[in-house]
């Protein structure tokens, strides 16, 4: 039976905090046990209640702290609590620093409930994978990575010429290919589309940093692009 994960929201705008709380509580496996509006309030709360928490939803723009100071303070003192950023901060430096701070996810406001629930589902799968185990296999870690890729693909607004159903087929084909990867021709045979169509989807996945390509040279020296999931 899946446990009920307890959540703290750190958000200075009480209206946004209320919306986030409702969205989280609408998920069957999560429950918000408190909200904090300042860094000082959050650290005081965590000093007493961190052991009861599983996850923090954290904004970057908190009035009494600068930048990601609160993230680092939480990470230094309360390492057993996972952190998911939910913020309007889009700066690359901010995102990179947050990732170095060990966050489990980074969501940009405004966040739709469906997207948040997808990320929470992925979090549940990760927690259940680790559970009380002392060791995991490489295959299990690969499956976890594939879940994360599917979540990201499912939530991204798609440009013209990219169909979600076809995109999912392409991602599934790359998953099955694993470390061997696929050429556009091989992908076309697997999903029943033209080579140019499959190449377009492969290049889209590269553009969104969910896939990569390597150039190989065949027996006659012709370059061949082979695609892999990141």
UniProtKB/Swiss-Prot annotation:
Domain Response regulatory: 6-124
Keyword field contains Phosphoprotein: yes
PTM field: Phosphorylated by CitS.
UniProt GO cellular component terms: cytoplasm
Pfam families: HTH_64, Response_reg
Presence of keyword Phosphoprotein: yes
Positions bearing 4-aspartylphosphate: 59
PROSITE patterns given in the database record: RESPONSE_REGULATORY
This protein's UniProt keywords: Activator, Cytoplasm, DNA-binding, Phosphoprotein, Transcription, Transcription regulation, Two-component regulatory system
Top-rank lineage group of the source organism: Bacteria
Function: Member of the two-component regulatory system CitT/CitS.
The name this protein goes by in its record: Transcriptional regulatory protein CitT
Organism: Halalkalibacterium halodurans (strain ATCC BAA-125 / DSM 18197 / FERM 7344 / JCM 9153 / C-125)
């Amino acid at each position: 039976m899946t446990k009920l994960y307890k959540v703290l929201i750190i958000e200075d705008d009480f209206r946004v905090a209320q919306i986030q709380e409702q969205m989280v509580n609408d998920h069957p496996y999560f429950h918000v046990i408190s909200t904090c509006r300042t860094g000082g309030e959050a650290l005081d709360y965590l000093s007493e209640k961190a052991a009861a928490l599983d996850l923090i939803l954290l904004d970057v723009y908190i009035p009494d702290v600068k930048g990601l100071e609160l993230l680092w303070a939480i990470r230094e003192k309360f390492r057993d609590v996972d952190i998911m950023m939910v913020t309007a901060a889009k700066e690359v430096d901010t995102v990179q620093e947050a990732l170095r701070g060990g966050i489990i996810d980074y969501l940009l406001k405004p966040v739709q409930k469906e997207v948040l629930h997808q990320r929470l589902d992925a979090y549940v799968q990760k927690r259940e994978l680790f559970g009380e185990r002392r060791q995991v296999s490489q295959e299990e870690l690969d499956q976890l990575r594939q879940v994360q890729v599917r979540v990201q693909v499912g939530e991204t607004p798609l440009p013209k010429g990219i169909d979600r159903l076809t995109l999912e087929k392409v991602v599934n084909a790359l998953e099955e290919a694993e470390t061997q990867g696929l050429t556009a021709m091989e992908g076309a045979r697997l999903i029943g589309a033209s080579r140019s169509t499959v190449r377009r989807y492969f290049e889209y996945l590269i553009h969104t940093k969910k896939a990569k390509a390597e150039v190989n040279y065949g027996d006659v020296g012709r370059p061949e692009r082979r695609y892999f999931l990141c």
